[in-house]
């Protein structure tokens, strides 16, 4: 459903991220720090840290910044101790929304998240209210024009779970969260470079929003993304504006 909007949605997401590069650096440093604290400072034995470092270097973060974040996570440098929290709720037309945060002040964060939901026509739900509607997986999105047959063969040989052909001509490769890095690297060596590659929470069923509803939903998502403590926002909504 709503495959025709997939590429437009991804391009909007990338443009929004590029416009908030400073905020992205802050979020990536938090993720690297927490990943190192929980799993150690060696990316070869810590997949979460490896992903965070890959993303940081993909955004041209200086190596010194990355190394300092790892040292803070490992306790070699002093730093803020962040707590991971997930909030769940509903947006326009009941579209599911998950908000992943890292914070040193839970009270401040929940107040900001609740305010964004309330102001923009959504509702903050309880733990577990929408998480079951999403699948934790790796996602690689390829622009329209990539050879479907060749990508399908290469992806399945690399260990991907599925290859989805969207109505707009874009292709999605779905992996398990633990096999994402190996599939991505194998495909890149075979000449397939994804426009977007991430471990994400993919909705099991999408909700197509059009016109005013799509505009309202975008405002809610933007408001959540603008909160300093927010790391990622996931939604079942596909916006057709």
UniProtKB/Swiss-Prot annotation:
Keywords assigned: Cytoplasm, DNA-binding, Transcription, Transcription regulation
Q: Which SUPFAM superfamilies match?
A: YebC-like (SSF75625)
Q: Report any Pfam family annotated for this entry.
A: TACO1_YebC_N
- Subcellular compartments: Cytoplasm
Main location (coarse class):
cytoplasm
Q: Does the keyword Transcription apply?
A: yes
Record-level Gene Ontology MF annotations: DNA binding
A GO CC annotation recorded here is: cytosol
A biological process (GO) annotation for this entry? regulation of DNA-templated transcription
- The yes or no answer to whether the keyword Ribonucleoprotein is present is no
Under NCBIfam families, the record lists: PRK00110.1, PRK12378.1, YebC/PmpR family DNA-binding transcriptional regulator
Q: Which family does it belong to?
A: Belongs to the TACO1 family.
The name on file for this protein is Probable transcriptional regulatory protein NE0210
- What organism is this sequence from? Nitrosomonas europaea (strain ATCC 19718 / CIP 103999 / KCTC 2705 / NBRC 14298)
């Amino acid at each position: 459903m709503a495959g025709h909007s997939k590429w437009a949605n991804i391009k909007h997401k990338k443009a929004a991220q590029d416009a908030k590069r400073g905020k992205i650096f802050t979020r990536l440093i938090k993720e690297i720090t927490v990943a190192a604290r929980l799993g150690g400072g060696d990316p070869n034995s810590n997949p979460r840290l490896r992903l965070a470092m890959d993303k940081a270097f993909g955004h041209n973060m200086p190596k010194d910044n990355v190394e300092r974040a790892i040292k803070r996570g490992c306790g070699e440098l002093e730093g803020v101790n962040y707590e991971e929290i997930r909030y769940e709720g509903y947006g326009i037309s009941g579209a599911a929304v998950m908000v992943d945060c890292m914070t040193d002040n839970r009270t401040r964060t929940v107040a900001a998240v609740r305010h964004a939901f309330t102001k923009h026509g959504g509702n903050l739900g309880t733990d577990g209210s929408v998480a079951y509607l999403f699948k934790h997986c790796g996602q690689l999105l390829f622009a329209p024009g990539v050879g479907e047959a060749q990508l399908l063969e290469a992806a399945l040989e690399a260990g991907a779970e599925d290859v989805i052909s969207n109505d707009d001509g874009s292709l999605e490769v779905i992996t398990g969260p633990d096999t994402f890095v190996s599939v991505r690297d194998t495909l890149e060596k075979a000449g397939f470079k994804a426009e977007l590659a991430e471990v994400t929470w993919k909705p099991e069923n999408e909700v197509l929003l059009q016109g005013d509803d799509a505009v309202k939903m975008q405002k809610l998502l933007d408001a959540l993304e603008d909160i300093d403590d927010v790391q990622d926002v996931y939604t079942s909504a596909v916006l057709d504006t």
